[in-house]
Amino acid sequence: MKLQTRAVIFVVYLFTLLGAPAQAAEPTKILLAHGAINNFVEPLWIAKEQGFFKKYGLDVDLIFIIAGRAAQAMLAGQVPVAMVGATHVTNAVTAGGDLTVILGLQNSLNYFFMARPSIKRAEELKGKKVAIGTPSGSASLATYVALDYLGLIPRRDNIVLLGIGGEPERLGALRAGSVEAASLSPEFGQILVSEGYRVLLDTGKEKVPFQSSGLVASRSYIKSNPQTVENLARGIVEGVAFILKPANKEIVVRSLARNLRLDKPDRLEKAYLQLIGELPKKPCPSMEGVASVLKLMVQHGLNAKAAQLKPEEIVDMSLCKKFEDSGFFKSLL
């Protein structure tokens, strides 16, 4: 009996000395906003659904906040990281904010400039109402580019530009007849094409370099949470690589259907093909695209101070350089 007691005491002593088995660290919770609902948000959805964020020790909550408000939420410290366009980063920086683009997920201006079925030619928009997105947002600039290309000048031609929320709201405004035209992403535009609405201009075919969306954070947050930001970026980059592998098409299409609420196979196929056709294999910010953003914002009177900025002032390429130098990008190709 004494021998058994001593054995138990010895085991307890060893357990105390060596400590209990280490428990897995709790994942870091983080809120990640996206400023639009379109197929280029898919890398975020896939990273969450396929466990890539979890792989890097993150518990990510994805939340939709319309782009301009998402940028404001970051500046207010309410949201640490978001997927928004370089237009909003430009506005923040020229107002004294410290937002910066660290990944590039959509590096071109790809919108359908849509009109109601009653509009047969662009000239018929004179004196009519056109919906734009948030002030200085990518959809707004796409509208200005489309009007320029079609030879229309809002002030001269009495075209009323109305700031109408996100894409679902602009689509709804077109259907309701409260506006005659609007810029929509191709996946939403295709819905209206099937209903008889007209594509007056496909800006994607014009190949306009443009940083439409990217992963954005404040420089102060990056400085105080470098590993969290890097892990988040790694998860998204793996999401991009997953999407671009043909073997994963069925999973990606199901995810698009669920998140975009698309149920028709032809629309899903077009959304998928557009995504894999434009999603960069190495999702880094496009310096040419950012330069184009700055130029267009000045040209259309959206932010005169943008003329004083260089692309390097609103972009941080350090993570992309690290991923390139370490072979992380190459390992996923």
Labelled PLM ranges:
Residues 20-24:
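Sec/Tat signal peptide C-region and signal peptidase I cleavage site
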Residues 87-88, 168-260:
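Pocket-lining segment of extracytoplasmic ligand-binding domains
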Residues 1-4:
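N-terminal secretory signal peptides that target proteins for export/translocation
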Residues 8-19:
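Bacterial N-terminal signal peptides
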Residues 223-306:
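Secondary-structure end/capping motifs
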Residues 294-333:
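Conserved C-terminal helix/tail region of periplasmic/extracytoplasmic solute-binding proteins
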Residues 25-166, 170-176, 180-186, 199-203, ...:
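Short, glycine-/small- and polar/acidic-enriched structural segments
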